[in-house]
Amino acid sequence: MVTTPNRSLLAAIKPYFEAGPLGALALGMASGTPYAMIAATLTTRLAESGIEKKSVTAFGLALLVYSFKPLWAPLIDRVRIPVLANLIGQRRAWLVVSIIMASAAITWLGLLDPTADLALFAAAAVAVGFAGATLDIVIDAIRIEWLRVDQMGAGSGMTQYGWRMGSYLAGAGALLLAAGGSWALAYASAVLLFAPSLIAAAVLGEPQRPPALQSGKGLSAAIKDSIIAPLADFLTRKGAWIVLAFVLVHKIGDTVCQLSVRLFYNDLGFTKEEVAFYDVSLGLFGYLAGVFLGGLIYKRVGLAGSVFLSLILMGVSNAAYAGLAIIGHDVWALALVQGFENLASGIGGVTVGAWLALLCDRRFTATQFALLSSAAAILGRAFSSGTAGALIESLGYVDFYWLTTVLALPGVLIFLWLWRAGLVVADDTVETATGA
């Protein structure tokens, strides 16, 4: 009997080390890299260059490109890249091409000086955003198609682990290399983080897809199958519009908060080395702990309860930044705030991410997941890019971060309504996914 707890622990962690979830880990690393280079890392670089707050937060528009993924996701579901697709398969061919695009764009951005030509620098940032968004479409499709239904929770967790590892290594590595005086080297080195995803794709092979999606058809049929059918499939389900409303609003507060954080740290006087260690490094451990806890909570509490808990935690974590604004420059306070924020984000990434994956019909994986994941961030990115800088200047950081906490409430309330209405079932099924 004394071995029961050990067996329970082994049973809990075993799914994370199966082939599909391990592949998701490698894919997540690739996904997090471009995002890191145009999010917090770019904000630090611009703030350090003396660019005014309004212009710095406006660069969040480069991230807004991610929100338009559904516009070209159908192409990735349907279009075969000549020669390469015949050699390694459609999904893996797109993976190789999108990684080449992202590597070139990241390297270009690192070579430019924002003080010399801000417009060209912005164009390069948008190019990284487009390449990263394309890579995300491919990665999400491969990940979901690699995983069995019973692996979705572990697979979502490992994706979050990988994403945070990629963004951590890219972000912290960039800060440390830049501290030595070379942003170009910092950006060029980040492309090495794409290698694990290519290795995973080589080992696990081309994911299996429904035969109906692999056959060639005429243009009108292709448009219907790749654009109209995925949207109609999702939007005609019971409660789909309410689910979409939740997806649109639940991350507004968190997105607005996070896109201003590096600017906030710069104004508080934290050095690049302090941010790299206390924010990025210690934050990573908080996030990894959150991902692990998220997987356990998902398994023990069920889908609905775990998502609701994570929404509460993510909202409360925004208020912690208001506390840091009051305290000021204090590395221990920074470590505490980042630890809690990343813990909450890790839990939320697993639970909400698993729900979004379960909502996807495998016939339209790339298109539907691109729609859901981009909708989850579009309002927050648009709001923060257009008004965050002005709000910080007019409200100050304390009131600004209280505002981001309030912005998290609509998502909590909508999800609570969905849960009570029976549109989210706690036994790892989602009623809207079946149309029941």
PLM regions: where:
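Transmembrane alpha-helices of Major Facilitator/SLC transporters
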Residues: V65-W72, Y278-R300, S310, M314-S317
